[in-house]
Amino acid sequence: MTSLSRPRVEFISTILQTVLNLGLLCLGLILVVFLGKETVHLADVLFAPEQTSKYELVEGLVVYFLYFEFIALIVKYFQSGFHFPLRYFVYIGITAIVRLIIVDHKSPLDVLIYSAAILLLVITLWLCNSKRLKRE
């Protein structure tokens, strides 16, 4: 079996990087559309007189922040030279678990487990922002 030459490997790498960039660009545009739809939905819920609309509003706000964080992650990917910073994934994980607690808070044990997961993610975030692991 022959090994690939260096120029061929670089060409394949460039093609794959371009496909990845185009895919992330499309995903970013789709997320912007969803962010716009969520904005309209939040405006509708804000002016709804029902009591349940308050819970919908809080849940919608957290979903809004999730869209926002994913878009920020894609922007940061392009700004940092095609690299995903780990801390952005941790932010998204914390926000997603907070949303889960807001939506599904019937079982106290589940809420405790979710809270422990958030604590673990916050510790991870602290470690990622420490001087030894800080890259930016």
Swiss-Prot record:
| Key words of the record | Cell inner membrane, Cell membrane, Membrane, Transmembrane, Transmembrane helix
Membrane topology is:
Multi-pass membrane protein
Which regions face the Cytoplasmic side of the membrane?
A: 1-14, 76-81, 129-136
- Which of the residues are on side Periplasmic? 36-54, 103-107
Source taxon at top rank? Bacteria
Question: What does the record say about induction?
Answer: Positively regulated by PhoB and negatively regulated by the cyclic AMP-cAMP receptor protein (cAMP-CRP) complex.
In terms of Pfam families, this protein maps to: PsiE
* Residue ranges crossing the lipid bilayer per the database entry: 15-35, 55-75, 82-102, 108-128
Alphabetized PANTHER family for the sequence: PROTEIN PSIE
Return the similarity comment.
Belongs to the PsiE family.
Q: What is this protein called?
A: Protein PsiE
The species this protein was found in: Escherichia coli (strain K12)
